[in-house]
Amino acid sequence: MEKQHSLIFLTGFSGSGKSSIGPLLANSLGYDFIDIDSAIEEQEGKTITRIFAEEGERAFRKLEQAMIATIAERKEMVASLGGGALEHTPTFELISTTGTLVYLKSDPKNLAKRLFHKTDRPLLRSSGTEKPDREALERNISAILEKRSPRYESAAITVYTDQKRIGSTVEELTRKIERFVRKQSSIEQNDQHKDRP
């Protein structure tokens, strides 16, 4: 499967801004947009929370991988991933070999602030409680981030989303992605010229 540098996979923890930044970024780049979680919900006719509750995380990760596989050869598309998508190794490998990974980075304190009132994040609920206190949530986020960090940090492009307007983040991402795609295309063209007899 050929790598498409203009197939942009947005990753980051829940609350990092993928769903709000994704459509604006796609519009800025002139690309199509897909939110993988929303596409799965539409396909399955149930929420992600319900899929986790009824079928478990493993079943959800398989649905997620299959959905990503359907767009793996697309060009000029921004795909917003679920926060834990990269934990599933086959999905991580599929993304790494088919597109460009972009990490929206945010610190645990800011993530906890944004996620405190959300009830639709199945992996963030502490055992036995629907909604943990803010400090417990921050500790939970820090622990999950530590586990996910190596794959998040493998992204070709990283942008910090803390203390920034969404518009500024979109502008920064647009510049970095356009520069990256141009550079990779140029490298590939040079390699093709070298391969010619």
UniProtKB/Swiss-Prot annotation:
- Cofactor note, please? Binds 1 Mg(2+) ion per subunit.
CDD domains this protein is in? SK
Pathway annotation from the record: Metabolic intermediate biosynthesis; chorismate biosynthesis; chorismate from D-erythrose 4-phosphate and phosphoenolpyruvate: step 5/7
Which cofactors must be present for this protein to function?
Answer: Mg(2+)
Chain residues that bind Mg(2+): 19
Q: Which GO terms describe its biological process?
A: amino acid biosynthetic process; aromatic amino acid family biosynthetic process; chorismate biosynthetic process
Q: Where in the cell is it found?
A: Cytoplasm
InterPro entries with a match to the protein in the record = P-loop_NTPase, Shikimate/glucono_kinase, Shikimate_kinase/TSH1
User: Which Pfam family, any one, appears in the UniProt record?
Assistant: SKI
Query: What cystine linkages occur within this chain?
Result: none
Name the positions where ATP binds: 15-20, 121
- GO annotations of cellular component type: cytosol
Residue intervals passing through the bilayer: none
Q: Give the family per the record.
A: Belongs to the shikimate kinase family.
Tell me the function of this protein. Catalyzes the specific phosphorylation of the 3-hydroxyl group of shikimic acid using ATP as a cosubstrate.
Entry's HAMAP family? Shikimate_kinase
Quaternary structure and partners:
Monomer.
Q: What is this protein called?
A: Shikimate kinase
Lineage of the source organism?
Bacteria, Pseudomonadati, Chlorobiota, Chlorobiia, Chlorobiales
